[in-house]
Design a protein with these regions (language model features):
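Reductase modules of NAD(P)H-dependent flavoproteins
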Residues: 1-79, 222-322
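Short, conserved phosphate/pyrophosphate- and ester-handling motifs at nucleotide-, phospho-/glycolipid
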Residues: 120, 199, 288
Length: 322
């Protein structure tokens, strides 16, 4: 089988993915998770049949245009591929970096002209000098002038450690990507938002968008962390709960706390026992992929239709440190 891409032709080995073939031939296609989640490796098919799995999770409009995930595409015949608009870069600048906790940074970026997104989506942040790229969810709402990211600080994290001193630096953005965003289908539909770690970032954007839209139905936001400090937006969430009677919050940590809303009960248990009619609710899950997969399955078994469960698992880079 042959793969045509940007004027070159490559031989595709038996069972090899399009991304592996292009990487082997140094074609310069970006990638991150290699599991079909981060959408870094989007390409467009100009000729050839697209395996269904290569378009799983993509917007209907993108599928219709022939977009595919190179990491998931193992074609049965020859293909001709091209880059697609979603991988186009937007120039931005880091305008503010501040700690939200010892392990989480708030990074604010200028919003490029014409950069439209929905709260809860994610971007690919690219460092121009060497092409280093990482996906981050947007914690800001679409009405805000600046883009806000919550970045987990990792000891050996190439991007996160660089961002500590990056105020004033030029960066590039790709996207937005993802379907984990607020859907104003009915103001009477309850919303459950549950996330671990910096999985709170997209949920914070979705929550505030719902409140700004006048969502009157019950809202539950649950955040899990390895310590009390890991509930890094607890004060902000508590303030919102005071202002909006329809909002209740809960925290899960391995230990007791003076705040009765924070307990040792697992995030999964709190979500399943949150008191909302799960079969009629719209649900958002973000963070640790094992948590997201497990709770998504449990919620489905509890009666929530899959098309009302929006999931955004956070994945580590494939085969390399952050």
């Amino acid at each position: 089988m042959r793969l045509a891409f940007e004027g070159q032709a490559f031989e595709l080995a038996e069972g090899e993915s399009v991304l592996d073939c292009l990487d082997r031939n140094q074609a310069g296609v970006p990638s991150f998770c290699r599991n079909g989640v981060c959408q870094s490796c989007l390409l467009r098919a100009e000729e050839g049949d697209i395996p269904a799995v290569a378009q799983q999770g993509l917007k209907e409009a993108w599928r219709a245009q022939g977009w595919l995930l190179a990491c998931m595409c193992r074609p049965a015949g020859d293909m001709q591929l091209a880059r697609c608009d979603a991988t186009r870069s937007h120039a931005a600048q880091v305008v503010d970096v501040a700690p939200l906790s010892e392990k989480v940074l708030r990074v604010r970026l200028t919003r490029p002209a014409g950069f439209d997104y929905s709260a809860g989506q994610f971007i690919q942040l690219l460092r121009p000098q060497d092409g280093l790229m990482r996906p981050y969810s947007l914690a800001s709402t679409a009405a805000e002038e600046l883009l806000e990211l919550h970045v987990a600080l990792l000891p050996q994290g190439q991007m996160s450690q660089w961002l500590i001193g990056a105020t004033g630096e030029q960066v590039e953005l790709r996207g937005p990507f993802g379907e984990c965003c607020y859907v104003a289908d009915t103001p009477a539909r309850p919303l459950l938002l549950a996330g671990t770690g910096t999985g709170l970032a997209p949920l914070f954007g979705v929550l505030r968008t719902a409140l700004q839209a006048g969502h009157a139905a019950p809202l539950r936001l649950l955040h899990g962390a390895a310590s009390r400090e890991g509930l890094y937006l607890w004060s902000a969430l508590a303030a919102l709960a005071v202002c909006y009677g329809q909002l209740e919050i809960g925290g899960s940590i391995p230990g007791s706390d003076t705040d009765a809303r924070i307990s040792e009960r697992s995030l999964q248990q709190q979500a399943l026992e949150c008191g909302l009619p799960l079969a009629d609710s719209r649900i958002y899950l973000c963070g640790n992929p094992d948590f997201v997969r497990s709770l998504r399955k449990q919620l489905y078994l509890a009666g929530t239709p899959l098309n009302r469960i929006h999931a955004d698992p956070f994945l580590a880079p494939a085969n390399r440190p952050d």
